Design a protein with these regions (language model features):
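PP2C/PPM-type serine/threonine phosphatase catalytic domain
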Residues: 1-216
Length: 216
């Protein structure tokens, strides 16, 4: 695990096979996370989100791929978009965030979101993205973002969280608890009274403190 960051990943679904996917990778002291939400109710949604994760995994393991150059990620999004459109296997949102020692960069498209929560503010990294434009339509124009090194807690999640919970409640939970506990509470937050979920949920929380990481 990178000594600079701690992270937790949580996935929840009513179904045997979720259409949401999230993974965290490391290259040296750089953390790379990807999150994808296959188009709900469409054939191949899980295949599409899985293809996005697989493309990022391949990029991270390719020594030629410059993970801290945002243009490389823009190009990757376009390659995935074209491949999914050609094969007609489904559509997916996509968020990639790269956390290095000096900066945070990322690329996104669709309605999954990435925020940085600090003590008194919320920085919506994905503000301005094309929420209706998913990978697999063959015309993606991803939004890019760049910030200084992470200060606060990074929250990246699908609309299974953001569509069903208020910003101020999400922020309160993240600020009040360690990230492992916060991840569990965020999933519980969007459960219905029956205990089921209105939608699949995938989320990743990252903090700058070097504590242990967990997968839920």
């Amino acid at each position: 695990m990178s000594p600079r960051f701690s992270f937790v990943r949580a996935l929840a679904s009513n179904r045997h096979k979720s259409e949401d996917a999230a993974e965290v990778f490391e290259r040296g002291e750089t953390l790379i996370l990807v999150l994808a939400d296959g188009a709900g109710g469409m054939r191949g949604g899980a295949i599409a989100s899985g293809a996005m994760v697989a493309a990022v995994r391949a990029a991270v393991t390719d020594p030629v791929f410059a993970v801290e150059d945002v243009q490389y990620w823009v190009d990757l999004f376009r390659v995935v978009d074209a491949a999914l459109a050609k094969n007609m296997v489904g559509e997916t949102t996509g968020v990639v965030v790269v956390l290095g020692s000096r900066k945070l960069i990322g690329v996104s498209t669709g309605d999954s979101e990435a925020w940085v929560l600090r003590a008194t503010e919320v920085d919506d990294l994905t503000r301005g993205q094309q929420t209706k434009q998913r990978l697999g339509r063959g015309r993606v124009e991803p939004v890019v973002f760049e910030r200084a090194a992470l200060s606060g807690t990074l929250v990246v999640a699908t609309d299974g969280l953001f569509k069903h919970a208020a910003l101020d409640v999400i922020a309160h939970i993240v600020r009040a608890s360690a990230i492992r506990i916060a991840a569990e509470e965020l999933v519980d937050l969007v459960r219905l009274r029956s205990g089921t979920l209105a939608d699949d949920v995938a989320l990743v929380l990252v903090a700058a403190a070097p504590t242990s990481s967990h997968d839920e």
